[in-house]
Amino acid sequence: MQSIQTVSENTIYVGASDRRLAKFENLFPIPRGVSYNAYVILDEKTALLDTADASVGAQFLENVAAALDGRKLDYLIVDHMEPDHAAMIEAVLVRWPDLRLVVNAKTLPMLKMYFPTDGAAFDDALVVKEGDTLDLGKHKLTFVMAPMVHWPEVMMTFDTTTGTLFSADAFGTFGALEGALFADEVDFAGKWLDDARRYYTNIVGKYGVQVQAVLKKAATLPIETIAPLHGPVWRKNLGWFIGKYDLWSRCEPEEKAVVVLYGSMYGNTASAANALAAKVAAKGVKVAVHDLSCIDNSEAVAECWRASTIVLATPTYNGGIYLPAANLLEDLKALNLHDRTFALVENGSWAPMSAKLMAAKIGELKNCTVLDAKVTVRGRLTATQDAELEACAAAVAASM
C-alpha cells in the first residue's frame, strides 16, 4: 500500500521508514528506527529528489509510482550518493528509463563506481554547478553545493517557487516517522532533539566549518520549508532548528551544564563520580551523569557537544585509560570537539594514572582546558577525601 504525503504545492513525500535496522551505518544504535526521505515535484516536468535505502526499496518505488499517478518521471536529482539515499537509483532507471539524471561533477564518478552497468544514463546526465537552475514549469530549482556535509559530492536543491530547501543530510535526525511528517506536529524538543543532536555530532560533527559555509548560503535564501533526507520536515519555527545547527557546527555548548561520564568495574569509581556530581549539583549547576559502559559512545559524544564542562571519571586499566573512556576521547578528537572544560577523576588500586593519560589526550583537542583540581581514588573513596571532592566541585562550578 502506498504511503505518500503532501509537503507543499505539488511536492509529495515518497520516503519510507525502517524500524528493523539496529545500527545506522552499522555503528550507531537507532532504537527508534530511521526514515529515508525522498520527494517528488509535479509540474510540467516531474522530478524525484533522491531515492532510498534498499531496505525500504519496495515501499519507496510504490510511493513514487503513486505520486506520479501514471505520469512519466522526467528527472532524478541526486543530492547525495550515500547508499542509504542512492541505493535505488538503478531500480528507478529500470522503472523509468527515459528520465534524465541531475548531478554535479563530483557525483558522476561515484555513480559509475556504485552502478557500473548504467553508463548510458550517466553519459546523458545533466551536470549542474552552484547557482544553476532547472525549470520544471512553475517550479524553478536552484542548486547549492554543500561539499563535505558530509560527503564531497553533496548538494542541496532549493525550490524558489515554494521556498523549499531539500537539504540532503543536513537538518536530519535519527528516528522513524510516526505518521506525522512535520516537526511542528510532534514534540520535537521533547522526543526528537536528542536524536537530532546525536545524528549531527556523530555523522556531521567533524565538518563544522563546512556546515557553517552552507548556513551562510542558506541565510541568503527565502526558505519556507526544510526537507531533509532523514526525520521530520520543517515548515514552522525554522530559526530554532537552524540555530541548533549553528551552535553545533561552531561546537558551542547548548547549555552551561556539566556532564559526568564515568567508567567503573566494581562500583568504586561510580561512587566517586556520583559523590562529585552531588556536590556540583548542590552549587546550583545542572548536572547529568552517565555510565560509559551503559550508553553508546554516540550518546556520550552528543552529551559532550551539549554541555560546557565534562567530568571524566575512570579507573586505570592495564596501565592505561579504561576502554570506554579511551574510545570516547578518540572519537572526540576525530570529530573535532573543541572549547570545553574538563575535570578528571582517576582510580587505581596500586598505580592510579588515568588522569595524566586522559589529560594528555584532552591536550590534543583544540582550546580545551583541564582543571587543576582532580580527584584521585585508591581503590575506594574515603571520608577523608571530602575536601578533595569539594575542591573539584568548586572548580567545576566556577568553570561555568
Model regions and ranges:
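Metallo-beta-lactamase
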Residues: 5-9, 102-154, 210-213
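Active-site metal-binding motif and surrounding structural segment of the metallo-beta-lactamase
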Residues: 44, 55-102
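Structural motif
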Residues: 45-47, 75, 139, 163-166, ...
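Short acidic active-site motifs
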Residues: 88, 296-300
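Conserved beta-strand hairpin/beta-sheet module of binuclear metal-dependent hydrolase folds
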Residues: 4-66, 156-159, 163-167, 269
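FMN-binding flavodoxin-like domain, especially the glycine-rich phosphate-binding loop
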Residues: 177, 188-226, 230-233, 275-290, ...
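Active-site neighborhood of phospho(di)ester-bond hydrolases with catalytic His/Asp-centered motifs
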Residues: 49-51, 73-81, 101-104, 165-169, ...
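Active-site-proximal loop/helix segment associated with metal-binding centers of metalloenzymes
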Residues: 150-154, 162, 170-205, 249-253
